[in-house]
Amino acid sequence: MIRYPVTMTSTVRPRHRQGPARLVGGVPYSDRASTLSLLPGAAVGRWLARQAPLVCGRLLDLGCGNQPFLPWYGPKVAEAVPVDAAPARGVLQVDLAGPLPFPDAGFDTILCTQVLEHVENAEHAMGEIARVLRPGGHALVTVPFLYPTHEAPYDFQRFTHHGLAGLVRRHGLEVAALDAQGGPVLMLAHFGVLALTQVLRLLRLADNRVLRALVAAPQEALRSRVSTRLSLPARVASLGYMVVARKPL
């Protein structure tokens, strides 16, 4: 693991700091101390676990926050480069709206989870992903669709599965896999937990450990059943979509 010194840019913005993912049977799940809604993270985590054979070599964790997925990808790669627009210890701070400070074809794997909605020009960002990815390499990209505004005012857009696939293809990458972050049921469950979270905050009970455990328990029980299949219902209503983008040889 190589960590780069922080380089200041003109873009300094706050970012939600998700705790390290918990590995359960090789699946990275959301840190329960960081969020009350665990099901979206379960969808992304289960999907990432299926892509594990593609994770290798030199990895770029683009928009990494505080690297919640490091426990998952760390043992799989020879080197990881963490990059984010917000300052964090051991993370290279880069304005994601500009060019990435890396040469062409420098990474075997790129991880970009729930980041592109926070970049005003997603076309530019995907172009940079394609540029720094080596031929034959894979980019694992997840984006939201029917998802509440977050990290305002740095929340600019949402993506349908058609939009995500088109974004990838326009920059010369192949869609090796396209999946969903659950369907309508998961989406409604997530919104229900968010509503409950707001009630607990109004009552100043959001940090109550007993209540947090009660909210988490049913989600923990259901996390292994979360589907990431791009089913017909999920094509219409999903929290988001996930793509494996491959750069042709």
Residue ranges and their predicted role:
Residues 1-105, 109-111, 235-242, 248-249:
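Conserved N-terminal segment of class I S-adenosyl-L-methionine
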Residues 34, 120-124, 128, 138-248:
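S-adenosyl-L-methionine-dependent methyltransferase catalytic module, highlighting the catalytic core
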Residues 40, 131-134:
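Short, cationic motifs built from Arg/Lys/His that form the positively charged side of catalytic pockets
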Residues 76-80, 98, 127-129, 156-159:
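Glycine-rich, phosphate-binding/catalytic loops in enzymes
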Residues 101, 106, 114, 137, ...:
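Conserved functional loop/turn residues at catalytic and ligand-binding sites
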Residues 108-120:
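A short SAM/SAH-binding and catalytic strip from SAM-dependent methyltransferases
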